[in-house]
């Protein structure tokens, strides 16, 4: 009798897999991550591919999910909405000592098993650089730094509920 009761209890349990502080529903096997088009006014031509690849790598590296083209158990889509450079840290002579590169992405996350986990949210991160530097000379490093921070934020929101 106790064996039957245990089997019934286990059959009704919903398990989740924990990874680096996050959870993935045990029923989830796949995630579809669409390319994030760059809809910002100022366009870095590589940013769409760099960002999308980084997000896929982050999720693939920290979850047991398989990336699929469409109809994933989880779906992540969105667009790059802002890519701006603004002066910060103005000096005494009214010229900026630093510039700030800011990237903003709009993300829509869908969990087919739990719609309470769905969200649509903008994420924004920045990196500063000396105004004496030309953006083109530091852009690749800054984009990598900002992209890593953005993918961490998106991962945490989707899988850590942070």
For the regions a language model picked out, list residue spans one by one:
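A structural "domain/chain start" motif
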Residues: 10-53, 57, 64-65, 113, ...
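Second-shell loop/turn segments in exported
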Residues: 37-44, 133-141
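Compositionally biased, intrinsically disordered linkers/stalks adjacent to structured regions
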Residues: 139-162
